[in-house]
């Protein structure tokens, strides 16, 4: 049972949207969900990580890169998706600095079957360390819908601190859509926690430049 009250959430979203309109910011702000946990020891308790696909894409401009075989490179070119082929990956020669730079440049990676197996050998553990190990794309799937699916997916990963933030929407979306995304994100996160809602200390939502508003 979700303890997130939809009225409280609805009111908070209107506040975030209203504040942004008032300030007339020049870019589309992202809406972030900030989570504080309690009764959780990252040293002892299992550090969870999980991904959930949201009903609406939170960040349409999210940068995705295809690590592709010849066929996928061709498809990526057609849809205007950034890509790297095996030769480009070989050139990186496991150089930690270059791999780190690559991981920083993109929010997420996709990879063809033939390439995904070679990633540890070609790039070392860098992408994995950054929490950006590529998602597999087969030739039976449409690359475009895989890109959209990736853009709609948010990842929760507990590291050493008991707070985290994830992008759950943007201010060009309808308030109802932002609400659906937040509800789904929160319910999924709670399902990952050992004691569910008893591990949640607080939840806030905020826009990129706005102030955080507490919803739980």
UniProtKB/Swiss-Prot annotation:
Organism of provenance: Oryza sativa subsp. japonica
Protein family: Belongs to the universal ribosomal protein uL1 family.
Superkingdom of this protein's organism: Eukaryota
Gene Ontology BP term (one): translation
InterPro entries: eL8/uL1-like (IPR050257), Ribosomal_uL1 (IPR002143), Ribosomal_uL1-like (IPR023674), Ribosomal_uL1/biogenesis (IPR028364), Ribosomal_uL1_3-a/b-sand (IPR016095), Ribosomal_uL1_CS (IPR023673)
Protein's name in the database: Large ribosomal subunit protein uL1
The encoding gene: RPL10A
Keyword terms of this UniProt record: Ribonucleoprotein, Ribosomal protein
Gene Ontology molecular function: RNA binding; structural constituent of ribosome
Keyword Ribosomal protein: yes
Gene Ontology CC terms: cytosolic large ribosomal subunit
